[in-house]
Amino acid sequence: IRPSNQGSSIGVSILKAVDIMTYRDSINAAFFIEHVSSPVWNAYSKEEKYIWAVEVSDIRGGIGFPVELAEQTIHHPQALVKYLDNYLITNDSCTIEGHMTEQRVIVESFIDGREFSCIVLRNEDQNAVALPPTEIVNSGDIYDYRSKYLPGLSRKITPIAVSDDHLQAIRSECERLYDYLGFHTYARIDGFINAEGKIFLNAPNTPSGMLPSSFFFHQAAEIGLNPSQFLSFIIRCSVPERLKD
């Protein structure tokens, strides 16, 4: 269950069992809505209230600030705590919504497989070329924002440890999607391969992260390019694309 416009790592939940309460909470999370009841709030200590408000304000796991309440827009955790302290004296519960809330959510089946990410380039001959894909081994069920950027929460293995046939199949499918969507210069395509070798491509991305630990540079190293060489190649291939515009 995830928002329709936030990619694959913000507001995402996995429903592991038939549980209406968990389902409701997951839908609310995807809509960036938070409910808090008076009994729960008033049982918190002052420190716990502030910690809760900070967590709600963090878009990576909460709903993000500013938040909308019945009477006003709030921009800071301390202001939210003060508001709830007053509001929940005379009210049973409070509904908090993110300022930029979603209008739709996506409910989709969980793909049980090995997750990968593949950089695809448009070379100087205008052919799509997929680099050796990277497998993402997560400590949890979702490769979310924290797993991407906090050390120790995921491992990256380049290339993904599958048979040569499956490796080539992944690259071919990524190249096919790259051409179908009309990408230019380069893109990152994420997906899964299951135990039967079926490939699911679920997240095409026009840009790719360029941190030192990013797939972008891992995969370039597999074909013998250091970061400077790879960026020079990207720039050289980008210039003709911009001239077309």
Regions from the PLM with identified roles:
Residues 1-106, 112, 124:
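Active-site nucleotide/adenylate-binding loops and adjacent lid/helix of ATP-dependent enzymes
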Residues 79-111, 115, 149-194:
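A long amphipathic alpha-helix within ATP-dependent nucleotide-binding catalytic cores
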Residues 163-245:
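ATP-dependent carboxylate activation and anion-phosphoryl transfer catalytic cores
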Residues 23-38, 126-150:
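Mobile, glycine-enriched helix-loop/loop "lid" segments at the mouths of ligand-binding/catalytic clefts
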Residues 116-120:
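Short beta-strand scaffold segments in enzyme catalytic cores
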